[in-house]
Amino acid sequence: MEQLKHECGVAMIRLLKPLEYYEKKYGTWMYGLNKLYLLMEKQHNRGQEGAGLACVKLEANPGEEYMFRERALGSGAITEIFENVQNNFKELTPEQLHDAAYAKRVLPFAGEVYMGHLRYSTTGKSGISYVHPFLRRNNWRAKNLALCGNFNMTNVDEIFARITAIGQHPRKYADTYIMLEQVGHRLDREVERVFNLAEAEGLTGMGITHYIEEHIDLANVLRTSSREWDGGYVICGLTGSGESFAIRDPWGIRPAFWYQDDEIAVLASERPVIQTALNVPFEEIKELQPGQALLISKEGKIRTSQINKPRENQACSFERIYFSRGSDVDIYKERKRLGEKLVPRILKAINNDIDHTVFSFIPNTAEVAFYGMLQGLDDYLNEEKVQQIASLGHNPNMEELEVILSRRIRSEKVAIKDIKLRTFIAEGNSRNDLAAHVYDITYGSLV
């Protein structure tokens, strides 16, 4: 089994209308910010060590900030980062708060492009500097990069050696820092490629800047970067000029789903959070395919591109069985089938002695598989009852019939997980100390 390094959650939003549109239709220009909060809160199961968000304004004058970030540590990080964002608006009058034009011109986080991340790591590295998104700054808007991801890279040493061989000097030896510098380097080269084209056409000054932002192709950046990646990943990024992307590994190890209509484009690690946050049906949400990238231009043009050739499907079993929300229709069915498929081994382990066995489940995420197991056990017991009744002949004794028909699969909530001490997706520093106290017994449940 692969060593778990990052099992995180990502969310990305691109508003496809001006902020004034959302103010008029939904009563707030913060529509995108509010949806990002929902997408992240609904994926809280994916990370409780920290959370972060990034935002890009499409329209900003030179000398004005256009790229914003907020990060926090701890299980309450989602609430904290959004409270910190809202603190920027506390002193506003009601008129200012509902003035989308004023917000775009003056307020931080009043943008059209958003990205969020929930952190869960077992690398042992902690601290705010390891919380995504990471930023790479530059005076050219198009060269600014915010990056986050749900990934486990297996060849970080090789990537580090390659980028240092060309003269780069990452500030830390950490996978995300290394990837940030690698993708950032390729982004620089892409901007310079388009810059040369603009100069060849005789453009100067801001004309070159606009040309770059209109013609930059993030597919080129991702092809040259990701060909060196080995492992499972969904990497998301925003540029300072308003382009955004998400790319999935060619083995389909890490999940990603996306949706678009005429108002918004959304990507998240899990499908049901999009269904809930946007109130859209299952059928309208697409899965980002292995090796594929979702690319959104500054103008809001959306396309997918096959960046890497798909390999043999190796979807992470941990993602499917444990980490993902059970409200996804496919995850729910898979977990039930898993429980049902365990029945033959369970029966062998108990020597088929159903009458003296009590069935339970632990942890809470095993509940759906438990239902599948009970269904399989019921099917087995019903077959056994039929055989027993048939063996009684044409005139069965009523008492014997009652004994057979009264047989049931015994199930109780024998073990419980103390929610206040849950350690698997909690702060890394306290995991080992608290692990022995995570589970409790329901006293008196077995008689």
Which stretches of residues belong to each language-model region?
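A recognition module on extended beta-rich or small alphabeta surfaces enriched in W/G with H and D/E
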Residues: 270, 285-292, 421-432
